[in-house]
Amino acid sequence: MLFKSLQSISSVKSVSQKSQLTNTINSTQFGSNSNQLLAVAACIDLNLAPLLSAHIDAFISL
């Protein structure tokens, strides 16, 4: 699970977002499972947000 979240970091374009996510995941490696899930959710959210916003924009324009 942590490996997948690290993979998603590599696809984040913004350097500040990447470092913020890296810090989040590094701090949660020894934390609770809920913190790790939040880190993974943050990766998923950053990767899917552009796709979702494009989809919503296309839907509104229809």
UniProtKB/Swiss-Prot annotation:
This is Protein sigN176. It comes from Dictyostelium discoideum.
